[in-house]
């Protein structure tokens, strides 16, 4: 990878962003300031590593000159050569193509699949797992919509998960690998003979656009229905037609939101979800030819196609994409997911380096 032109462009962009962020006028537009802050946070480690590398190279040149006259500098030359090799590897890793959405917040949908009531209960377990993980990281979780099963599981649920600051590695960078079919093996609460059953639930994850206006949505393409809420949105729920269902006619995408207190708030939230799904659809279509080999999120919840298995009798979790296995399923379901996510991120980083 040739780093010089790319680094020069990044140094210039970093300097320009530093000026912009110091200008109070930028912060009058919260969305623009946040976008600039995230980009600045992404570039800062690259700039810092490049500066360390440049300094080390200068020091090496000086040490080599001195060692020609004084052999005592030979050890310093060796140390600097080792340090430079390490910094070059770090910089090469940083310059690998990044996911442009890594700093974004997300919308996450959990849907029950085959397995009836047991699948719905497992879908609720998954939703709680993500909520616990978000709480561990200090992120904000909002339940936008939920449809409960008879036993308190989730037929489907939509969560908005947002970080509370500007970071190059935001919510999407950690949870983007969760899209797909999750399989569970356990004895259902409805099983009287103690037999282990297999069922599945599906997860869809979308990066959330900074503003709905960033995504072109023609109002004439929408059918908007209102109905009485059935969720837990607090005062006003079940007394007025505050829930909103939006159907995007060209794609058939249907979005519902009922947990906000007013119809206006629910419509705004539903439009956010729709914008995220349309953005993801457009990007998926644009990348279909260029990245045909990369796995996409599985939109049909089929037990035969899965990314991960949760085996309760053996307290084992297995991610089939990277061969990750751990016997701490109880902790994982309580939000202890970092070891798994680190393994997935490492595999993704390796693939991006190979592409570069």
UniProtKB/Swiss-Prot annotation:
Stored Gene3D superfamilies: 3.30.160.20, 3.30.70.1660, 6.10.140.1950
SMART domains xref list: PCRF
Subcellular location as annotated: Cytoplasm
Any single GO CC term annotated in Swiss-Prot or TrEMBL for this entry: cytoplasm
Entry-annotated residues carrying N5-methylglutamine: 235
Protein modification: Methylated by PrmC. Methylation increases the termination efficiency of RF1.
Pfam families, per database record: PCRF, RF-1
SUPFAM superfamilies in the record: Release factor
Statement: the UniProt record of this protein carries the keyword Glycosyltransferase: no
Endpoints of the signal sequence: none
Main location: cytoplasm
InterPro entries xrefs: PCRF, Pep_chain_release_fac_I, Pep_chain_release_fac_I_sf, Prokaryotic/Mito_RF, RF-1
Keywords of this entry: Cytoplasm, Methylation, Protein biosynthesis
Molecular function terms, GO-annotated: translation release factor activity, codon specific
Function: Peptide chain release factor 1 directs the termination of translation in response to the peptide chain termination codons UAG and UAA.
Family: Belongs to the prokaryotic/mitochondrial release factor family.
Name of this protein: Peptide chain release factor 1
Organism of origin: Mycobacteroides abscessus (strain ATCC 19977 / DSM 44196 / CCUG 20993 / CIP 104536 / JCM 13569 / NCTC 13031 / TMC 1543 / L948) (Mycobacterium abscessus)
Gene expressing this chain: prfA
């Amino acid at each position: 990878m040739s780093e010089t032109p790319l680094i020069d462009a990044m140094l210039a962009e970093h300097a320009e962003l530093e000026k912009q962020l110091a200008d109070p006028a930028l912060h009058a537009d919260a969305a623009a300031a946040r976008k600039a802050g995230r980009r600045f946070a992404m570039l800062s480690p690259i700039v810092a590593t490049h500066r360390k590398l440049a300094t080390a190279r200068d020091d090496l040149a000086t040490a080599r000159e001195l060692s020609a006259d004084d052999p005592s500098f030979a050890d310093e030359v060796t140390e600097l050569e080792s340090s430079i090799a390490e910094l070059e590897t770090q910089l090469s890793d940083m310059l690998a193509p990044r996911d442009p959405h890594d700093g974004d917040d997300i919308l996450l949908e959990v849907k029950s699949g085959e397995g009836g009531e047991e699948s719905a209960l497992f879908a609720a377990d998954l939703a709680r797992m993500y909520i616990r993980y978000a709480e561990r990281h200090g992120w904000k979780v909002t339940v936008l919509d939920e449809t409960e099963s008879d036993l308190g599981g989730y037929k489907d649920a939509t969560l908005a998960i947002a970080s509370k600051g500007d970071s190059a590695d935001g919510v999407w960078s950690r949870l983007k690998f969760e899209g797909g079919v999750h399989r569970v093996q356990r004895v259902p609460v409805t099983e009287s003979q103690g037999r282990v059953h297999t069922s599945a639930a599906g997860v869809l994850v979308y990066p959330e656009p900074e503003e709905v206006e960033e995504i072109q949505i023609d109002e004439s393409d929408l059918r908007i229905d209102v109905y009485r809420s059935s969720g837990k949105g607090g005062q006003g729920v079940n007394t007025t037609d505050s829930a909103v269902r939006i159907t995007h006619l060209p794609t058939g995408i249907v979005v519902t939101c009922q947990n906000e207190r007013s119809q206006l708030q629910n419509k705004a939230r539903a439009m956010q979800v729709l914008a995220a799904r349309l953005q993801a659809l457009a990007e998926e279509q644009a990348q279909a030819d260029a990245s045909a080999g990369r796995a996409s999120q599985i939109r049909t919840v089929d037990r035969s196609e899965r990314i991960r298995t949760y085996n309760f009798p053996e307290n084992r979790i297995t991610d089939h994409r990277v061969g990750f296995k751990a016997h701490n399923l109880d902790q994982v379901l309580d939000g202890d997911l970092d070891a798994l996510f680190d393994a997935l991120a490492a595999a993704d980083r390796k693939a991006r380096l190979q592409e570069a």
